[in-house]
Amino acid sequence: MNLKLSSWNATAFFQDLVARNKFATAQGFSFCRVSGLEGFEEALQTMQSTTAFVCVSDMSQGYIALANTPRTRRVKTIFLAMRHAIDDMEARLSCMETLRELFRQFMSQLILERTRLEQSCIYLDERITFNEMNEYFFSGCACAYFQIAVDTFTDLRYNADEWNNE
């Protein structure tokens, strides 16, 4: 049975967006790959000279739906962060506005990507939430994240060749 599944490389997609987006470039955003929330925190701690981040988690949550059209859903998390002076709430607010605008611009590209992906039977959930993290999550850094759910067809037909004789 063919194990190659249709997939979408969220990491490569957002790395490309960070490189091509004029706003991200002007604001000094750097791209990095992390492993979950812990990896995001570690990136913030170790990359002290970087002022703004777009981090895509290489981990995903998901499930398989056993319906008439079986599909696999994977949820990718993208973290955004921007440093500011500690205890400066005005600076934090300004950074959060920057993160919101970057999210908006990313979504304008994701609409186009969604149409392209549907031609390959890869479906992005239209509901993409933007979540701002508490000011105490990481001192001196405005942080937010959003998640994208990606659905792909999953072939669940029984194949006797995959099993030992019973």
List each language-model region with its residue ranges.
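Acidic-leaning, charged glycine-interspersed low-complexity segments
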Residues: 18, 22-26, 49-51, 96-151
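Oligomerization/assembly interface segments of phage tail-like spikes and tubes
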Residues: 70-85, 140-153
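A hydrophobic membrane-anchoring alpha-helix module
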Residues: 146-166
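Short, cysteine-centered beta-strand-loop-beta hairpins and adjacent loop/turn segments enriched
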Residues: 63-64, 83-88, 153-159
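Small/polar-rich, solvent-exposed N-terminal microdomains that initiate assembly or binding
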Residues: 1-68, 161-166
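Extracellular/virion structural assembly segments
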Residues: 1-12, 67-73, 81-108
